[in-house]
Amino acid sequence: MTSENVSEYGRLTPMLAALEALVRCESPTEDVDACRNVVRLASDIATRVLGTPAEIKEIEGRPVFWWGAQNPEIVLLAHLDTVWPHGSYQPLWEVKGDVIRGPGVFDM
């Protein structure tokens, strides 16, 4: 799918809203409660977009977003923590033209 397709089919606005919500949900790697919050948020987004909530598992004390075999055609491999300590990034979310800046915008 090209960026033109994203705009053409009306997906750009909800995609950007989801990305912004994930970025604004600060989740430093070592803050397990904050990581749980971002995993719950990702599950809420998945439920809205795909109609299927993720199972949230705890593996070695860390929250994991898991679909299992419910959507075998989808592979999502990512990290959801924004890594940086709370308040490290200012502004947390910034859009200038077609450039978005913030923790995790490239790989969330």
Describe the predicted segments one by one.
Residues 2-104:
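Acidic/His- and Gly-rich active-site-bordering loop/insert found
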Residues 108:
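DPxDG-like acidic metal-binding loop motif
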